[in-house]
Amino acid sequence: MYFNIQRFSTHDGDGIRTILFLKGCSLSCPWCQNPESRSAKHSLLFDERSCMADCQLCVSAYKQTVNGDMASDGIRRIDDQIIINRKAMSEAQIIALRNVCPTQALSICGEAAKSDDLFEVLMKDKPFYDQSQGGVTFSGGEPLMQPSLVAELAERLHQNHVSTAVESCMHVPWKNVEKSRRILIAG
């Protein structure tokens, strides 16, 4: 699962880089730059400033996911505010809200990480990597929580002469580090 691909970055390794932000982190650092990345699952984001509470499309869509059960309190309107109880919502209910909000005050963070699709996107910037001695940086969240994906992508990138870097706190099981060891050394 990933939540962003940032192209043309110059701050996360040598040269021009593309950063793949992966979801999932076992820490809860108060200074985290990407708190939306903590959950390895889809996350519901809400920007109250963009919300037109009168529209209530999110409330209606949520009610459909619970078959109109008024006791369920995942999303409800109280006075002129939308109240969200993320703990009361399943991942399927969160995904069902993906394109409901016309102002995008309510959005979903997280996309399924399909290796072939990600590789194709990451390779789009190959001319920039070649010119600047850049490459791809795996970040997050904690990228080593998805060691198979990171190892597979890094292997394919290396085969295409693209350097890789990993931003990690290393707070993962040692087997995850072992699985990614070759890419950590090869860079």
Residue positions per predicted region:
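N-terminal cysteine/histidine-rich coordination modules
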Residues: 1-38, 43
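Conserved Radical SAM active-site core
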Residues: 38-181
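Non-cysteine beta-strand/loop elements that form the S-adenosyl-L-methionine
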Residues: 183-187
